[in-house]
């Protein structure tokens, strides 16, 4: 069975390619490399001993998509391709709406035309409204997003669920991720953000390796045990395995289903700093700065539905996440730039 992975050279995409290949699937990737490095796919091949068929290009390129579907017998699509920086989306809303919505529209048009109607979408916990009680369930309120990135994920969910409602041949799975961190235990692939990292863990590892002076902790006056923001951090390998479980589900089902992929456990920023220091025997200097607008005090998942329906559960703990993140960064101080 051949799975098309859009954005497959990226952080979560590359880890998912490893798990798909290890589970016996063939993998075809399209990626425009705007936020990824092609070395990641070479390393995926080295880890698995299997080949990835790679097309460099944009998912909005309809002719290229038609070529990919003509040359490969694609059974299902995992759709990662998209811009993903919250702050950047506020500064460049048009670019985010154009990229993140039109990739989905062009992709589903071609999929409909060729009769491949099975898609897994990489959504996000950002689709949930800020006024929900914790933990977040798939039935918690969505919408009223605080930034264009969140809105693009919300709108894409609406597009895909609408398609599945109108055409009963479609099978759609929407995976709402919480906060992926960590790296493959080999240290060969990991998170390699362009420029200043937007997420906690890559910033933390870059401080630890000496690329940045200190970590900025945004706010210590939240209504949380230590005053810093609490999030549901999930190991990227667990997340990738969730996609393999979703593939098994999507090829046998119809309609549209939503699943949270998280651990159900919330850790604060300072919890993360201290756990990282302890797991790796390094010091991470940090400073407390003002809150970031739009940040919630607490956000964590109820992942019970994923376990019940997909048979998937996160297995790796906080120490694993911290150790594997540092293993990747210390072996690759400049990321894929080495």
Q: What do these predicted ranges mean?
A:
Residues 1-183:
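N-terminal Rossmann-like NAD(P)+-binding domain of SDR-like oxidoreductases, especially those catalyzing
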Residues 2-4, 94-95, 147, 191, ...:
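Short, contiguous strand/loop micro-motifs
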Residues 184-197, 204-207, 213:
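Hydrophobic, Gly/Ser/Ala-rich alpha-helical and linker tracts in large acyl-processing enzymes
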Residues 200-338:
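C-terminal substrate-binding subdomain of Rossmann-fold SDR/epimerase-dehydratase oxidoreductases
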């Amino acid at each position: 069975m051949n799975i098309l992975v859009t954005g497959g050279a990226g952080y979560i995409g590359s880890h998912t390619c490893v798990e798909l290949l290890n589970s016996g699937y063939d993998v075809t990737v399209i990626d425009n490399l705007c936020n990824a490095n092609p070395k990641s796919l070479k390393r995926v091949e080295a880890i698995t001993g299997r080949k990835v068929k790679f097309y460099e290009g944009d998912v909005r390129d309809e002719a290229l998509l038609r070529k990919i579907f003509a040359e490969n017998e694609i059974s299902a699509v995992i759709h990662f391709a998209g811009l993903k920086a919250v702050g950047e989306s506020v500064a460049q809303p048009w670019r985010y709406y154009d990229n993140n919505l039109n990739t989905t529209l062009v992709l589903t048009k071609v999929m409909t035309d060729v009769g491949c109607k099975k898609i897994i979408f990489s959504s996000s916990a950002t689709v949930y409204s800020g006024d929900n009680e914790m933990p977040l369930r798939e039935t918690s309120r969505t919408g009223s997003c605080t930034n264009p990135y969140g809105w693009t994920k919300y709108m894409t969910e609406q597009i895909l669920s609408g398609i599945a409602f109108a055409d009963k041949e479609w099978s759609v799975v929407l995976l709402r991720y919480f906060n992926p961190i960590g790296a493959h235990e080999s240290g060969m692939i990991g998170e390699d953000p362009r420029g200043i990292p937007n997420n906690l863990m890559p910033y933390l590892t870059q401080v630890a390796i000496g690329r940045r002076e200190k970590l900025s902790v945004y706010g210590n006056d939240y209504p949380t045990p230590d005053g810093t923001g609490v999030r549901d951090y999930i190991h990227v390998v667990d997340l990738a395995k969730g996609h393999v479980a979703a593939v098994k589900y999507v090829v046998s089902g119809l309609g549209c289903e939503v699943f949270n992929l998280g651990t159900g456990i919330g850790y604060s920023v300072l919890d993360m700093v201290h756990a990282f220091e302890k797991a790796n025997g390094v010091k991470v200097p940090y400073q407390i700065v003002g809150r970031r607008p739009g940040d919630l005090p607490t956000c964590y998942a109820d992942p019970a539905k994923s376990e019940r329906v997909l048979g998937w559960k996160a297995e790796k703990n906080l120490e694993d996440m911290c150790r594997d993140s540092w293993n990747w960064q210390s072996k690759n101080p400049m990321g894929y730039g080495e």
